[in-house]
A protein has these predicted regions:
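N-terminal intrinsically disordered/low-complexity leader segments
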Residues: 1-40, 182, 232-237
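Helix-turn-helix
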Residues: 44, 52-86, 90
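An amphipathic alpha-helix signature
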Residues: 46, 121, 125, 161-172, ...
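Hydrophobic alpha-helical connector segments
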Residues: 86, 90, 104-133, 185-192, ...
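Short secondary-structure transition hinges
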Residues: 136-165
Length: 237
């Protein structure tokens, strides 16, 4: 996934996740709030859409195929989503809300000394895991963003900006201690988050070039640690 971080736009991912859980956000296409069975049907349709995205181009996906996979009818699908793209948009929104775990890792991690390097490793692992888990949806987000769809573009900005802002706060905290001088915190954090996201998106491609993911992981973590703290990373054991 090619990544563009846009620091000017800030979004609270935690707040997004909370709002995503509200029943009124699960309204059917006719405006009604579905009951328990309706919510279960809607969730099953989303799960089937996500599963089909792993093996099928989203442009080739048809409502009838998703409905059949979910054990229901196209008419039922249209009760909840206007079209396939609308269902994928919901999956993308849920994916962005799940990005709060990346924000939490940055905010709660200890960035000093060897503990800081462990935090950088954990953040790198979390990015790799996040991209592997959400890769089918992220592909659609990326393609739709390139094509100018602002809905998907805003989701991508929301996901990456939240991490960037939190990491910039860590850089600024080191600067307040007289360390990591000479860099603008948001620019530094944006560069590091872009590296994390792009490498996470393409680490499987490195394997085809004979570059092990384990080695890529260490390389990225060392860059993140050095860029955040301005301290030399510890020598790998």
């Amino acid at each position: 996934m090619s990544v563009v971080v846009e620091p000017a736009q800030t979004v609270d991912v935690v707040d997004t996740a909370r709002r995503a859980a509200k029943p009124e956000d699960l309204r059917a296409a006719d405006g009604r709030v579905p009951g328990r069975r309706g919510r279960a049907t809607r969730q099953r349709l989303l799960e089937c859409t996500a599963e089909m995205l792993r093996t099928t181009s989203y442009r080739s996906m048809k409502v009838i195929d998703i409905a059949r996979e979910a054990g229901t009818s196209p008419a039922t699908f249209y009760q909840y989503f206007a079209d396939v793209e609308a269902a994928i948009l919901v999956l993308a929104q849920e994916m962005a809300a799940d990005g709060e775990r990346l924000v939490r890792l940055v905010a709660e991690g200890n960035w000093k000394g060897r503990a800081g390097y462990r935090t950088a490793l954990e953040l790198t692992d979390a990015f790799f895991e996040f991209w592997d888990q959400h890769r089918p949806v992220l592909r659609v987000v990326d393609l739709s963003t390139v094509e100018g769809d602002r809905r998907f573009r805003n989701i991508r900005v929301r996901l990456l900006n939240a991490v960037t802002i939190e990491l910039a706060a860590v850089v600024a905290a080191f600067q307040a201690e007289g360390k990591n001088q000479g860099v603008e915190p948001m620019a530094q954090a944006g560069t590091l988050v872009t590296t994390l996201a792009n490498v996470a998106a393409h680490h499987l491609g490195f394997e085809f070039w004979g570059i092990r993911t384990a080695d890529v992981r260490i390389s990225v973590a060392r860059q993140v640690y050095w860029g955040t703290t301005a301290q030399r990373p510890p020598t790998p054991s």
